[in-house]
Amino acid sequence: QADFSRVRAQMEKVRTDPTTPDTRLSDNPNPFNPATPGALVQQMVGGLTPRHGCPLHARVRYFDPVAGRPGMPEGVGALVEKLEADSMTVTLVNTDPTASRDVVIEAGAYAEHQFTGVRIDGRETAIGDTSLGVHLAPGAGATLEIDMERYVNAPTFAFPWDR
């Protein structure tokens, strides 16, 4: 709710800006930026919004292995439902009704954590790695209960498929 209030307040500042285009500096819109990623960071990666150049501390990070880039594949959503000291629960959903999607989940924002196991629909699988792959059928979702050891690996910017 706080994030939505901030967006509304920022947009009101834009609408009531008394300056004219010919007197406005090029960076004038910066104080009015309505982007508010806090809730998205908390709900998708289980982290806190980084402030003032600080690194992102998060439980997971997502990659699109087909596009070879960081981030979610098109049409895939994630919701972190629960965080414990050594585990988390996240639900992934593929909103595309006709195409499947693959997602790589990394342990931490920089692979600093280690996945030890995952439970999906009651089936448990041991992992022992900094990432895991999930295949989502068209229009399907999955709730993953992931066990992890936190801050046991040296952080890296390398993509999961380059390690």
Model-based region annotation:
Residues 1-89, 95-98, 144:
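Catalytic domains of carbohydrate-active enzymes that cleave complex glycans
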Residues 84-86, 107, 114, 152:
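Extracellular/surface-associated beta-sandwich interaction domains
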